Amino acid sequence: MISRVSRFMTTFVSKYLPDPLIFAVLLTFVTFICAWGLTDSTPVDLVNMWGNGFWNLLGFGMQMALIVVTGNALATSPQIRKFLSTIASIAKTPAQGVVLVTFMGSIACIINWGFGLVVGAMFAKEVARRIKGSDYALLIACAYIAFMTWGGGFSGSMPLLAATPGNPVAHLMMSESNPQGIIPAVSTLFSGYNIFITLSLVICLPFITYMMMPKNGETKSIDPKLIAPDPTFDKKLDKDATLAEKMEESRFLAYTIGALGYSYLGMYFYKNGFNLTINNVNLIFLITGIVLHGSPMAYMRAIINATRSTAGILVQFPFYAGVQLMMEHSGLGGLITEFFINVANKDSFPLLTFFSSAFINFAVPSGGGHWVIQGPFVIPAAQALGADLGKSTMAIAYGEQWMNMAQPFWALPALGIAGLGVRDIMGFCMTALIFTAPIFIIGLYFL
């Protein structure tokens, strides 16, 4: 059954799903029209919201571009190539490759979403190189499907924000018993329902992707250039090399800047615990890449080779920033959330919050953005109904991570690394969306 659904969804997506840029543009107009028709915002207001928000994700877009290029450059270092090759050698058949990529990606995304998203795609690429007859598009889809575990992991935006004093919704939860207005991690990340949902995904996702394996003769051929071995970036100097050339290829400079970076990271983690952020992941990738490549210019050549992967991120993120601000400032996000809240009771509230979050995710594919838009409506409603605040908060996170399988926004880094288009993987991802729904329903309603 899973295989049949996968074939249908893949065929459907290949015909009707546009390029992610077209998707972002169409979403802009849909959000504009809905906000105009359903809220008090005028067209002039909405144009201003869109324009004012258009550049709001510049910092975030830079972070995403960096995680792609630094992760890609790190993967092309000789040591990481050897490591990925060793792990990939565990799989001997295309089916084993699919299971291994999904499982490893799921674990990596639980540890840190940025790390898992990039490393998963790089690992899938290595498996495709090693195992002849692999469906490359399915392997890259497996890496993105594994991203479904991130919201309940250690870098999940929602539980971390909810546990942080001064977060955008903290004032709604302040009381004598909770003066800081926080939801502790024991009520979210380390709760029974989150452990059930996250472990169920780790166990079930490899099985689901295994069942998507194409039948004999149905594996799509790909351009061999996509999985061709990456070039080497070291450079041997001649005896008459200039001082400038020697500095450019200097191991001393590479190791010195590496020592500086690792010293900072050591002090940071000593002070803050193992609190990984996207900036820390980027710094780890960058510093480690310089050290492993062995010289500043060898690393720079690897970065130049990787930058072509960032085009989609650089162009599309501003459109999503504009959509997000329209959604937030017009009140459209609140209307959608209130619609689901009004038909809920204490038991069904987290589940309906989950579906409202999934719906909003098309316009706001960001965990932190969901907390800003939905938190002010979800938290008071949960309090009024007597629903579990931790579960209601995590329901927002689950809806976002689940619907990512139908929203190409977060697939852009993986697709950039893989050299594929969104139509190549979204059929598989939407199949995973369908067959993982029961896991979230059981966890939110019955536990």
UniProtKB/Swiss-Prot annotation:
> Per the record, GO CC terms?
plasma membrane
Q: Which UniProt keywords apply?
A: Cell inner membrane, Cell membrane, Membrane, Transmembrane, Transmembrane helix, Transport
Origin: domain of life: Bacteria
Residues passing through the membrane, by range:
17-37, 49-69, 98-118, 136-156, 188-208, 252-272, 284-304, 321-341, 359-379, 402-422, 427-447
Q: Where in the cell is it found?
A: Cell inner membrane
Kindly report the protein's main subcellular placement as a broad class.
membrane
InterPro entries assigned to the protein according to its UniProt record, in alphabetical order:
CHP00366, SCFA_transpt_AtoE
List the membrane topology term(s). Multi-pass membrane protein
Q: What is this protein's function per UniProt?
A: May be responsible for the uptake of short-chain fatty acids.
Q: What is this protein identified as? A: Putative short-chain fatty acid transporter
Q: What is the lineage of its organism?
A: Bacteria, Pseudomonadati, Pseudomonadota, Gammaproteobacteria, Pasteurellales
